[in-house]
Swiss-Prot record:
Protein name: Chitinase
GO process terms (BP): chitin catabolic process; defense response to fungus; killing of cells of another organism; polysaccharide catabolic process
Taxonomic source organism: Streptomyces violaceus
Family: Belongs to the glycosyl hydrolase 18 family. Chitinase class II subfamily.
Protein function: Antifungal activity. Inhibits the mycelial growth of A.niger, A.alternata and H.sativum.
Length: 15
């Protein structure tokens, strides 16, 4: 959901 996040949800967009 949030690109460049830090495992915001389940690590979908973990940068």
């Amino acid at each position: 959901e949030q690109p460049g996040g830090d495992k915001v949800n389940l690590g979908y967009f973990t940068n």
